[in-house]
């Protein structure tokens, strides 16, 4: 689409326009316009002059005198809008072609095509939202975890900002007190002051660590727990994977070495995302490709969170089984020992198997011919390894920049506490901690850094 804006300079003073709804057909599409010329563009599109702010109107939409659609239009007068500027929304029928034509009409009338995240950038620069609220709005769009929605909604409401600002205010009071006492000799500094400051710093550090720990745990949950399924060929790994997926995802065959590479699928278990990794059967092989698959299987044990070690209960322990046991011991990960094929006569020496395992483990017997009966037990054993997160009334850090800033603030507060006897150093580290807190909600980034941050947003946002 050609942008016919008379100015090629991309400035925050431009009137911008974009389609705010996802691509594809739907009931409606929304075109947003923001800037000093937004209302004038809407008047020309509708051939109407009277628009009361925050009232919805059904209006015909024209382009060069040609009727395009009958749409719902709303005018938000500055500063009472998302961006803080005049904003107009056009809600048309959900044809992608129609939305593109209306957008082009906006561009023909002087708007510029918005860059990704530019509406949010305007809101940020016009002090309609702080950085923590902007981050929350993006994560809310991307969120796939119901337990996180409440924390994001609270952050969007501004509760993280309030938490940070209250902490910042308390630290500023400590800084002011320490600056007053710098000119005093050490023996003139009240001992009660040092004790109170130390107590307050410990309390602040603990609250920051709680926020950081919860955010890190939630990030791991969002990423998903990696669960590797390992065993010798024909132990029943692929059958177990298929049963857990309730579909034929992995090829099940009596021919050894059928699975030559890792197969990865994602399921949800007890509210947690789990990445199931079916690995190549571990055995000695002259086949170069199969050996590469086996090496990849052993490597997956180093990077996973939980291991399902699958053993054939109907056969005595073999050299390949002991190779797997050694791999489990080296990985030092939580392990569920799955004794498969319990519908056949047991020949596996269970006590020998137990004596060779040097890691925490639990045991589950399964029958791949009727494995659904034990899937519930398997799910409970797997979920027992998941951390129990209390998401009620919790705040959440949603970006690496936020986590880094808080980690730096914690480090500086600890440094300040360690230098309580030297108030100049104490004040220096305390000020550094405050500056790191500032970057969570009121960053001092350059224009280029802001452009980079907001470019990650979607168009129309």
From Swiss-Prot:
Enzyme class: hydrolase
Cofactor note text: Binds 1 potassium ion per subunit.
InterPro entries the record matches: G_TrmE, GTP-bd, GTP-bd_TrmE_N, GTPase_MnmE, MnmE_dom2, MnmE_helical, P-loop_NTPase, Small_GTP-bd
Residues at which (6S)-5-formyl-5,6,7,8-tetrahydrofolate binds: 32, 89, 128, 461
Pfam families tied to this protein: MMR_HSR1, MnmE_helical, TrmE_N
EC number, as in UniProt: 3.6.-.-
Residue ranges of domain TrmE-type G in the record: 224-387
Record: residues binding GTP: 234-239, 253-259, 278-281
Binding site for Mg(2+): 238, 259
Coiled-coil ranges from the UniProt annotation: none
Cofactor(s) required, per the database record: K(+)
Gene Ontology terms describing biological process: tRNA methylation; tRNA wobble uridine modification
A single GO cellular-component term on record: cytosol
Localization per record: Cytoplasm
Molecular functions per Gene Ontology: GTP binding; GTPase activity; metal ion binding
Keywords linked to the UniProt accession: Cytoplasm, GTP-binding, Hydrolase, Magnesium, Metal-binding, Nucleotide-binding, Potassium, tRNA processing
Homology family: Belongs to the TRAFAC class TrmE-Era-EngA-EngB-Septin-like GTPase superfamily. TrmE GTPase family.
Subunit structure and binding partners: Homodimer. Heterotetramer of two MnmE and two MnmG subunits.
PANTHER family: TRNA MODIFICATION GTPASE GTPBP3, TRNA MODIFICATION GTPASE GTPBP3, MITOCHONDRIAL
Function: Exhibits a very high intrinsic GTPase hydrolysis rate. Involved in the addition of a carboxymethylaminomethyl (cmnm) group at the wobble position (U34) of certain tRNAs, forming tRNA-cmnm(5)s(2)U34.
Entry protein name: tRNA modification GTPase MnmE
Annotated source species: Helicobacter pylori (strain HPAG1)
Gene that encodes it: mnmE
